[in-house]
């Protein structure tokens, strides 16, 4: 019987081992318990699965197993044949010769004879390995039909013993390849694993599939035999070793077997895997989290299943409580994939994900730091109200000093979002030299818009609406940032960067000390040039009756509004006011009063209000026929617009005849100041009652990466988290950047 030959095989191997000094690897089991193909990168090489889950050595006795005379004769002939081959090819492999050679060895020394004998011994060892390999394969192949029959036996004891034998065979390479070549046996193993209630049988069968999964042929055999649903079922086992074998085998299938991901999803594998995040074995968790990443990447439904089963909370808990680098890295990969899902993002943030990820920004592992940075970048647009981010903000400011492009991209983008509409964060970043660090990042970035644009947006946030805003405005000047910032207005820079730069210049102009440096940098001609170009483009679409298109996500009307608003603030300085007037801008400003966009009407009336302080400019405004649209704007629902219009009308009526002035006065009183006497004083002094720029958020940007591009890392869906009104001067949120998921490594 072939099974008897398998039982006697260890005896024969022992005899062979006594005849030479090199271990064949069969008797000792060296390198037979191989970790998962993928887990070789996840688990330490010196701590393979055998040390984590110890398999019991099972000795199968021959009692009760019938053995006829033919079997004995076959066994004797096989043994004699192998012995004759060895004696013919390697006569020195006998036990006596080997012992004589060993007897000549002196501890700690190698004789010349031994050195001369080494090549011969190596050759003998290789030949013995070959003989062992061939015998294992031949013996296993002959035993396969009988083992398959025993696995299908109705007696559970017989099935268990058969599973133990197959498990031992699966640990040897030659016999393992024979097993993979038998679809009937693999199917029997899968069936046994799925139907058994015996823990030892479950352990042996999962171990068999685990060993087969280290070869592509084995993966295919498992897949074709319906092994995936059975392995998913084993994820509910109470036995740790069974869990390990099942998750590792599934991991190898997910990595290398086509169709495995869909099969795992259909078998409800995610629903079984997410609860495993509560286990406390770091290496087991590392494989589990990598399975989640492979399943979630590029599949929105999988991301939602992970969310529904409490995945974000479990993943954040791992990032918070563990220090094993490979586990932290694989977990950060999953969070990175989930961080572009609009549903998962708030859940991760609410679970404390920002703080947990921030803990690892100072790690010695570059790949972990990079994953944490990207994930923080992706989550930051929904974390603007989060507390406890002080240490994260400080680390991000420090990260601005590095030269790595990815680090700078993530750090600037995250700072841009976390300083959006958050006065506390703005103040903290400003007080920790954030302005200086951002300026230096811009200077080093060159033409890399992925760094420059978020850095400019962050500076725009820091220079407005918080207690240290004036300090930030001055800091830009003191760190020689104004010339570099003004240069960003030049084409062919991308429109999002130009738009952000215009808003920053507007904020810098709020500080009187910045007016002279801005003028020296020739900011006014550049703003006027951009204004004219953007207005012409917008008018062409109006004339053609087409909707205003977006250029790189920016409408030309936004550029018109931004440039006019910046010129409005700059016009508070007499020298700037004169330069703006000499550039023949008044006809354009008057034309903008007819715009259908309320914000454009407001900033146009505002800049005319400043220019009208000079008599020559006031006369030019009147000559352009501004009175009619200004009278209409007195009835505007926007108080700022109405106030500016009243101030301009009041100024240009000063030199008119008494009848005209009386008519203007009556109109002002009836339309604007009937219930607000203070507004009349404001109009007379041309001081706006309210800050004209609302604290609206910019529309969000593109996601960092998308699940629909090649793997390592992320999801390329447009990640819009709100339809916010566009305002050039407002704080703007930045969603994740698009990036291929293969960057996840």
From Swiss-Prot:
In residue terms, where are the ARM repeats?
132-171, 172-215, 216-255, 258-297, 298-341, 342-381, 383-420, 423-464, 470-510, 512-551, 574-613, 615-661
- Give the principal location in a single coarse category: other
Membrane topology, record value? Peripheral membrane protein
**Expression sites by tissue:** Expressed in the mammary epithelium (at protein level).
Tell me the Gene Ontology biological-process terms attached to this UniProt entry. bundle of His cell-Purkinje myocyte adhesion involved in cell communication; cell adhesion; cell migration; cell-cell adhesion; cellular response to indole-3-methanol; desmosome assembly; detection of mechanical stimulus; negative regulation of blood vessel endothelial cell migration
Does the record carry Acetylation as a key word?
yes
| Reported modifications of this chain | May be phosphorylated by FER.
Where in or outside the cell? Cell junction, Adherens junction; Cell junction, Desmosome; Cytoplasm, Cytoskeleton; Cell membrane
Q: Which residues carry this modification: Phosphoserine?
A: 99, 125, 182, 665, 730
Give the glycosylated residues. Answer: 14
GO-annotated cellular components: adherens junction; catenin complex; cell-cell junction; cornified envelope; cytosol; desmosome; gamma-catenin-TCF7L2 complex; intercalated disc
Q: Which Pfam families match?
A: Arm
Annotated stretches, region: Interaction with DSC1 and DSG1: 132-297
Interaction with DSC1, as annotated region? 574-661
* Residues where N-acetylmethionine is found: 1
Give the molecular function GO annotations: alpha-catenin binding; cadherin binding; cytoskeletal protein-membrane anchor activity; protein phosphatase binding; transcription coactivator activity
Give the keywords, sorted. Acetylation, Cell adhesion, Cell junction, Cell membrane, Cytoplasm, Cytoskeleton, Glycoprotein, Membrane, Nucleus, Phosphoprotein, Repeat
SMART domains assigned to the protein according to its UniProt record, in alphabetical order: ARM
Q: Relate the assembly described in the record.
A: Homodimer. Component of an E-cadherin/catenin adhesion complex composed of at least E-cadherin/CDH1 and gamma-catenin/JUP, and possibly alpha-catenin/CTNNA1; the complex is located to adherens junctions. The stable association of CTNNA1 is controversial as CTNNA1 was shown not to bind to F-actin when assembled in the complex. Interacts with MUC1. Interacts with CAV1. Interacts with PTPRJ. Interacts with DSG1. Interacts with DSC1 and DSC2. Interacts with PKP2. Interacts with PKP3 (via N-terminus); the interaction is required for PKP3 localization to desmosome cell-cell junctions.
Q: What does this protein do?
A: Common junctional plaque protein. The membrane-associated plaques are architectural elements in an important strategic position to influence the arrangement and function of both the cytoskeleton and the cells within the tissue. The presence of plakoglobin in both the desmosomes and in the intermediate junctions suggests that it plays a central role in the structure and function of submembranous plaques. Acts as a substrate for VE-PTP and is required by it to stimulate VE-cadherin function in endothelial cells.
Instruction: Give the family from UniProt.
Output: Belongs to the beta-catenin family.
Q: What is known of its domains?
A: The entire ARM repeats region mediates binding to CDH1/E-cadherin. The N-terminus and first three ARM repeats are sufficient for binding to DSG1. The N-terminus and first ARM repeat are sufficient for association with CTNNA1. DSC1 association requires both ends of the ARM repeat region.
Name of this chain's protein: Junction plakoglobin
Q: Which organism is it from?
A: Mus musculus (Mouse)
